Swiss-Prot record:
UniProt keyword terms in alphabetical order: Endoplasmic reticulum, Lipid biosynthesis, Lipid metabolism, Membrane, Methyltransferase, Phospholipid biosynthesis, Phospholipid metabolism, S-adenosyl-L-methionine, Transferase, Transmembrane, Transmembrane helix
Protein name stated in the entry: Phosphatidylethanolamine N-methyltransferase
Signal peptide interval: none
PANTHER family (UniProt xref): PHOSPHATIDYLETHANOLAMINE N-METHYLTRANSFERASE
MF-aspect GO terms: phosphatidylethanolamine N-methyltransferase activity
Entry's family note: Belongs to the class VI-like SAM-binding methyltransferase superfamily. CHO2 family.
Alphabetized HAMAP family for the sequence: PEMT
Topology with respect to the bilayer: Multi-pass membrane protein
Gene that produces this protein: CHO2
Organism: Scheffersomyces stipitis (strain ATCC 58785 / CBS 6054 / NBRC 10063 / NRRL Y-11545) (Yeast)
């Protein structure tokens, strides 16, 4: 590129470059194309004069073609030529240079920089470089790669500047067509708004280009890394505008084109802008991105590791990619087929039937609203319960279903409901289409513009969703952090790669922008209501459920750090003092949140409510219990019952509690009755006080086998096994006369407790837990002798095996505070022993503990 004359010493100052063959050199200073071509203080090279002549030659069209309507197709043809030269001409050269080092090889084979060569092309190229760099520039002291890049830059200057100039000519000719049409046929406020917004987009586009060039310099602007590398520039730069959006030169770097279309009020300009932007995205995908991955991307080992992590992620989904919308559809998977049927029914079948049945618009609308409300309430409620109490996970683990199944089945529920909402929304608009859009629209102008913007928003939502899945995988897409502990997942930290580099919550707006697009295309009141429901639900779910759960799991430092957009906004668009103040306020707010003992989340409020319910129970004194149990008429009775084997309560408030016995422990009862009135058919029964307190003198309730005859006037009997209640509560013994249910005496009430069993988190202590369970429960209920005895064989001696399993699961759940279900004992993939059961309980405990672990 042309530059001012430099001294030899200054030429040696600058960044260091290295070719792909290993030669190092000092990279001289270069300038951008605008300064090179239009700054009069910068010397112009031979090719630069030719480029300027080509640019100004476009003005000949205005002189030679007086009819403006004829100029438009001419400039459109020019623009298409230069745009194709850009994306396919430069693209072809860069592709070959990246793959085969083709441009450098051509230079070497043609001896372009060999002063001894007699070819006219070589002499012209050498003269061109001398005119760019100055007469003192020593071509031989620089590698052929750098010199080739200097020549390549001139071709880039010609194509890019011609592309932009011809586009401006298209804009100008379209704007002034039909006597300055862009200023007429609209209300003045609308014209002014259009001009202000259009100029705003152009100014923003200009800022993006300037900021991008200041960040990456000429080296990257002219694709220098296709020819050589700069030392200490081995990583991609994420600063300035590159921290705001991915590939800003190709994304928001073309937003000014749409500003020009808005100013010109021309669909022709809009189509040209879309055409150019579309080709640029193709160039990015097929030329730029492959080279970026080659130069700056991960190594093959890292790529393979990433693929393995993705495959490992699929273990939560039966090792198959789960259905997202209708993507990853598998006709052999029942849930996928059902989703397809439901989507087809709500999107097409119901609207068609409703249309053929007359005006059923209200039915279709309320159906869409009802389904969205159902999805919002059910998904938000389930996520809240899962975050608070691990509701979903507990149910699966208690039934001995693998942890991964909970996430897989949740994914089916979540995706099915989401599919229903979008299918019903589509069905609502399909019905309006079938009816000829008889519903009154809020506005009906600019149909083509509305369709373009609407489709663009729908595409944006699809692209953002795809980018989210690429960044966080299916695990993150389906809220895996709610269901799977961090130690079971490949995601140990929140990702800041992909789209999350620029936005903390990209789905906050872009996750529902497609619904906004539907409203823009069909702006009916019904679509406005649906749009509001989608946006409101999305806001609540992200900010009041997902965000607070992420803080629990990953901590505030990871969740609340500024996104790339926020950093750039603070750095470039607001004063430094205010930016610093905002940062300090954020830190202070985080410190305040750490110091507060109370929480603001929905789940913690629910937790406090449950605790209040537990502590609000009225306590009865021991005397009150005795009075409740015993009739005062028995106080001086000749009949007596003494219960032995009870333990005295040693707790702080023992005055409120009766004596107790551990569940399953034998209870010995001694009776005494008058010999002269004693009958061999007198009997003693065991009852729960809450079931018999309404009748003191006569028992109206069956003892259900928990009784024994008193054949002697005095004696004792031990209640054990099936003659006991195997659940907590307050109980009593009753002495009955002569085979009847007439009560002669009621014993002192006593409590049956389930002893607490501590569950360790260390697998090595599984044997200790197994022995504890064996002694306290299994030896008493099933008569097992060791932790390795089969539970199934011992339970089969009972008349009702399933009832035994239900009883065991209930007792063990209460004792260990780890919920298990009867199905735990029905699995045959491992020996069904107390030892294996203890291992399962420890596993469940570890999972729930890790899910409940809140970062400070």
């Amino acid at each position: 590129m042309a530059t001012k004359t430099k001294t030899a010493s200054s030429a040696k100052v600058g960044p260091k470059g290295i070719t792909f063959s290993g030669d190092t050199f000092v990279v001289p200073e270069t300038h951008d194309m605008v300064k090179t071509l239009f700054d009069p203080t910068v010397r112009k090279s031979n090719l630069e004069f030719i480029i300027l002549a080509c640019l100004f030659s476009n003005l000949l069209v205005f002189w030679l073609v007086p009819e403006n309507s004829l100029r438009i197709p001419i400039f459109i043809g020019f623009y298409i030529f230069w745009r194709l030269s850009y994306n396919f001409g430069i693209g072809y050269l860069l592709h070959n240079q990246s793959k085969y080092n083709r441009l450098v090889e051509w230079s070497r084979n043609l001896r372009l920089f060999d002063a001894k060569s007699n070819s006219a092309l070589s002499k012209f190229i050498i003269a061109e470089i001398k005119s760019q760099r100055g007469a003192e520039y020593d071509i031989d002291s620089y590698p052929i790669e750098f010199n080739t890049w200097l020549v390549f830059r001139k071709f880039v200057d010609l194509v890019l500047m011609s592309d932009f100039v011809t586009f401006i000519c298209v804009v100008w000719t379209c704007a002034i067509n039909n006597n300055n049409e862009f200023l007429h046929d609209q209300k003045i406020w609308l014209v002014n708004t259009r001009l202000v917004v259009g100029f705003g987009l152009i100014v923003f586009n200009f800022w993006v280009k300037v900021n991008a060039h200041n960040t990456i310099k000429d080296y990257a602007w002219y694709w220098g890394d296709f020819f050589f590398r700069q030392i200490n520039n081995e990583e991609l730069i994420f600063d300035g505008v590159f921290e705001m959006v991915p590939h800003p030169m190709y994304s928001v770097g073309y937003i000014g084109y749409y500003g020009f279309a808005l100013i010109a009020k021309s669909y022709t300009v809009l189509v040209i802008a879309i055409f150019g932007h579309f080709l640029q995205m193709i160039f990015l995908h097929y030329i730029e991105n492959p080279h970026i991955d080659k130069i700056y991307g991960p190594s093959k080992n890292q790529i393979n590791l990433f693929k393995l992590l993705k495959l490992r992620d699929l273990k939560n989904f039966d090792n198959l990619k789960p259905l997202v919308g209708l993507y990853n559809f598998n006709y052999l998977r029942g849930s996928d087929v059902m989703n397809l049927i439901l989507v087809g029914t709500y999107a097409f079948v119901l609207p068609i039937f409703a249309s053929s049945a007359g005006n059923r618009f209200d039915f279709v609308f309320f159906l869409a609203v009802g389904i969205k409300l159902l999805e919002s309430f059910s998904i938000n409620t389930l996520l809240t319960l899962q975050s608070h109490s691990k509701f979903f996970t507990k149910w699966y683990l208690s039934n001995d279903i693998p942890l991964e199944k909970s996430l897989n089945n949740w994914a089916v529920i979540y995706n099915s409901l989401i599919n229903l909402t979008y299918a019903s929304l589509f069905g609502l608009n399909f019905y309006q289409y079938l009816q000829g859009f008889t519903s009154e629209l809020l506005f009906s102008q600019w149909l083509y513009l509305r369709v373009f913007v609407g489709l663009l928003l729908i595409f944006t939502q699809s692209w953002i969703n795809s980018s989210i899945i690429d960044s966080i995988g299916y695990f993150g897409w389906f809220y895996g952090d709610f269901f799977i502990p961090k130690s079971y997942s490949s995601m140990q930290h929140l990702t800041k790669a992909g789209v999350y580099r620029y936005l903390n919550n990209p789905e906050q707006i872009f996750g529902v922008c497609g619904v906004m697009g539907v409203f823009i295309m069909v702006p009916s009141v019904e679509n406005l209501v649906c749009c509001f429901l989608w946006v409101a639900n999305n806001f609540v779910r992200i900010n009041f459920i997902e965000r607070w759960h992420m803080i629990k799991v990953y901590g505030e430092q990871e969740v609340l750090q500024d996104s790339g957009v926020t950093k750039t906004f603070k750095k470039h668009l607001i004063p430094e003092v205010i930016s610093r103040r905002l940062s300090n306020d954020t830190e202070n707010n985080q410190n305040i949140r750490r110091r507060k003992s109370s929480s603001f989340t929905i789940t913690d409020s629910l937790d406090n409510f449950i605790k209040e319910l537990k502590t609000s129970k009225t306590k009865l004194s021991k005397q009150k219990l005795i009075e409740l149990s015993q009739s005062l008429s028995f106080e001086n009775s000749d009949y007596k019952l003494n219960v032995s084997g009870l333990q005295a309560t040693t707790e702080k408030d023992s005055e409120y509690l009766p004596n107790y016995v551990d569940v399953g422990s034998p209870i010995e009862v001694q009776w005494t009755s008058p010999k002269e009135t004693h009958s061999e058919r007198d009997w003693i029964g065991l009852y729960r006080i809450i079931q018999t307190s309404y009748s003191r003198n006569k028992t109206l309730l069956s003892s259900s086998g928990r009784w024994t005859f008193c054949k002697e006037s005095s004696g004792k009997f031990t209640f054990a096994g099936n003659k006991l209640f195997w659940e907590e509560g307050v109980y009593e013994f009753r002495y009955h006369l002569n085979g009847s249910h007439d009560v002669a005496y009621i014993s002192e009430p006593f409590e049956v407790r389930i002893p607490s069993v501590s569950v360790p988190l260390d697998d090595s202590k599984s044997d200790e837990l197994a022995k504890d369970l064996q002694v306290k429960f299994f030896s008493k209920l099933l008569n097992t002798r060791s932790v390795d005895d089969s539970i199934s064989e011992a339970a089969s001696e009972s008349d009702n095996v399933l009832e035994v399993y239900k009883l065991l699961s209930k007792i063990i759940s209460q004792a260990t505070n780890v919920s298990i279900g009867p199905k735990v004992f029905l699995q045959h993939d491992a020996p069904n022993t107390v030892a294996t059961l203890s291992s399962k309980i420890i596993h469940i405990k570890k999972v729930l503990e890790e899910l409940s672990n809140i970062q400070n």
